[in-house]
Amino acid sequence: MEPISHLVKSSLPNYLSSLPVPDSIGGWFKLSFKDWLALIPPTVVVAGLGYTAYLAYCPAARASCAAKNSGRCNNHIRKNEPKVVDMIDVEDIAEKAAFCRCWKTKNWPYCDGSHGEHNKQTGDNVGPIVIKK
């Protein structure tokens, strides 16, 4: 318990009092590069705490996180149907056709390259199914 007491009563107040926080708005423009570097760690801590509080207490943030972590693949294609199934006759394919597997395409069931952006954002490697005649 002694180390925590020392941190709260001595180390942290000494650190905060040594930060180069100016008294006026004009003082911010007179800070040196070294002063700006000294202000980075507390700024990162405050921003991290603010972001954590935002995720914890903002309903919009919780809803978007829940949607991303739901495990659902299809987020917008024919949601009124219990199961999305497309039957395509091989005889109707001219030479080759690329079919979507990532559910991001706007031209369902054909691939329009939307998986490229998905792969960049998530580090995934999904691609289309290509059928040749």
From Swiss-Prot:
It is found in: Endoplasmic reticulum membrane. It comes from the Eukaryota. GO terms for molecular function: 2 iron, 2 sulfur cluster binding; L-cysteine transaminase activity; metal ion binding. Residues 59-133 are cytoplasmic. Its cofactor is [2Fe-2S] cluster. [2Fe-2S] cluster binds at residues 100, 102, 111, 115. Residues 1-35 are lumenal. Keywords: 2Fe-2S, Endoplasmic reticulum, Iron, Iron-sulfur, Membrane, Metal-binding, Transmembrane, Transmembrane helix. It holds the Pfam family zf-CDGSH. It is a single-pass membrane protein. GO terms for cellular component: endoplasmic reticulum membrane; mitochondrial outer membrane. One of its GO terms (biological process) is regulation of autophagy. Signal peptide: none annotated. Binds 1 [2Fe-2S] cluster. The chain crosses the membrane at residues 36-58. Belongs to the CISD protein family. CISD2 subfamily. This is CDGSH iron-sulfur domain protein.
